[in-house]
């Protein structure tokens, strides 16, 4: 029923230490990737220190006898080095002895298991008119018209971290471009989720910000599967691209990012999300589809992002939507019509569909001259209306509104 990119259940509450950094442990039954870890360095570690550390990891791994993982294949060792505005981390495959040695390093903050990220089932319903655009631009439910300023997010850039985008879809009018791919060698959306999300953010027919530029950042494959470390790698690329390689903040302040994905709470993911917000990029994320407290999910639990729950047509919380104090705002998430690859349409439900409404409003407001970055979420909350019935324990009752006056 619900539709969101999500990881299978995983808890990182427990941890062990080896005379140094915390080694976070997955709960029993968690869908971790065997022998795969994300290592996060302490705040204040310099690029020189990080480089020396990863060089040490590489040399130490090479000196040891070849290790084979659970699938009998040789372990890869260090795979990705990641940098977020002075925050460093890396991912790789290591045996327990190597992880224990890494944890003893004074510059390491914590280590957590890498885990699988997948899509839940897709909900499709034919011939249902979309209602989300009308709802976010009118004060009462039941409308059929979308009211918006003709600026429509012009001059902004929306990064869609997902399954990719069908950039040739006619609804995007040439405004969709391919950014990067961190999961496979197919630079296309062979799943459909990312194209649907992009259509809600900035499609000509279904989009909130109809003139924003859309950038595809693929972190999930055709089956909707990927890894947490791959998602973080995609996040790093967005931050670098939006900040012009670190030399400019002007593009970042006019950039928005959508993550209709998530999983169990991950300190590495939350730290990466905070770095993106700190760089001046507005980040909208899905609250989750488990009808549970979103404080247990990432990146939804990161305070600096704009966490979005899903509402139904009658202004109630969608039955599947997560709730809790981490939720910033509600947006339409039931039976949302948008694009699919090949110029068709699909009707999907989930907080995956709610989040791009907020990402689109972010681009729309920046186009109107509002200040971008994480403070934009406060602007959106201030404009939202307290109309959601039964939002959930400790949860805001505010539904997004674009300020049309209608």
Swiss-Prot record:
The keyword Glycoprotein applies. GO terms for cellular component: extracellular region. Glycans are attached at residues 223, 247, 258, 343, 402. GO terms for biological process: proteolysis. GO terms for molecular function: serine-type endopeptidase activity. The active site is at residues 162, 193, 352. Residues 1-20 form the signal peptide. It is found in: Secreted. It is an enzyme of class 3 (hydrolase). PANTHER family: CEREVISIN-RELATED (PTHR43806:SF11), PEPTIDASE S8 (PTHR43806). Secreted subtilisin-like serine protease with keratinolytic activity that contributes to pathogenicity. This is Subtilisin-like protease 6. The lineage of its organism: Eukaryota, Fungi, Dikarya, Ascomycota, Pezizomycotina. The gene is SUB6.
